[in-house]
Amino acid sequence: MKKIKVCLVDDNRELIGLLEDYISEQEDMEVIGVAYNGQECLSILKDKNPDVLVLDIIMPHLDGLAVLGQLKEMKKENYPNVIMLTAFGQEDVTKKAVDLGAAYFILKPFDMENLVNHIRQVSGQTSSFMQRSSSSMRSHRDSKPANLDASITSIIHEIGVPAHIKGYLYLREAISMVYKDIELLGSITKVLYPDIAKKYNTTASRVERAIR
């Protein structure tokens, strides 16, 4: 069986280590390179041809968008399928990344099983592996919301958002909603903020100001 070749790029070394271990455990995948900034990523891509590039947007030296721009200029014969990782969704950034060739967006924090399934999808592999694990996925489905809430709380604390401000509640809700429906990243001001505003009986503009 031909394995999906994956390259991982993120300045969070701990996350890269976890992803590398998890992906390497998949029967149909192999990690052929890891990088911690945009320059290292481009160096790897000069010599290697991953099927899927998992790329963080915010990184030192060169960010994810700059990497996409330079990757396009390289005119590689085998252009990788790019999955972007992002902590915050902004419509202008999302649109620019798509224009530069990004195939999919995943909002941090994310479920690793969800990521590997998307790696299979963008690489065009069959869904047999997804079907094989469907029963185990169903058995864990009830526990996911609690794990998701814990992950969201952890990441918000890490970026230093105080729990007592309103933006904290709105941000938690936004992350949870986008986790369940990634397409909301393309309609942040038109759908996401208004939906949060309805839930908290406020206006979309106030939600946006509080989050920013």
From Swiss-Prot:
**DNA-binding region boundaries:** 194-212
Top-level taxon of the source organism: Bacteria
Give the UniProt record's GO annotations in the biological process aspect: detection of stimulus; phosphorelay signal transduction system; regulation of sporulation resulting in formation of a cellular spore; sporulation resulting in formation of a cellular spore
- Database matches in Pfam families: Response_reg, Spo0A_C
Annotated localization: Cytoplasm
- Essential cofactor(s): Ca(2+)
Kindly list the positions at which 4-aspartylphosphate occurs in this protein: 56
**What post-translational modification does the entry describe?**
Phosphorylated by KinA and KinB.
- Give the GO molecular function terms: calcium ion binding; DNA binding; DNA-binding transcription factor activity
Against InterPro entries, the record matches this protein to:
CheY-like_superfamily (IPR011006), Sig_transdc_resp-reg_C-effctor (IPR016032), Sig_transdc_resp-reg_receiver (IPR001789), Spo0A_C (IPR014879), Spore_0_A (IPR012052), ST_Response_Regulator (IPR052048), WH-like_DNA-bd_sf (IPR036388)
Q: Which UniProt keywords apply?
A: Activator, Calcium, Cytoplasm, DNA-binding, Metal-binding, Phosphoprotein, Repressor, Sporulation, Transcription, Transcription regulation, Two-component regulatory system
User: May I have one GO cellular component term?
Assistant: cytoplasm
Q: How is the cofactor bound?
A: Binds 1 Ca(2+) ion per subunit.
Q: Which residues bind Ca(2+)?
A: 10-11, 56
Q: For the Response regulatory domain, which residue ranges apply?
A: 5-123
As for what it does, the entry says: May play the central regulatory role in sporulation. It may be an element of the effector pathway responsible for the activation of sporulation genes in response to nutritional stress. Spo0A may act in concert with Spo0H (a sigma factor) to control the expression of some genes that are critical to the sporulation process. Repressor of abrB, activator of the spoIIa operon. Binds the DNA sequence 5'-TGNCGAA-3' (0A box).
The protein's name in its UniProt record: Stage 0 sporulation protein A
What's the source species for this entry? Answer: Priestia megaterium (Bacillus megaterium)
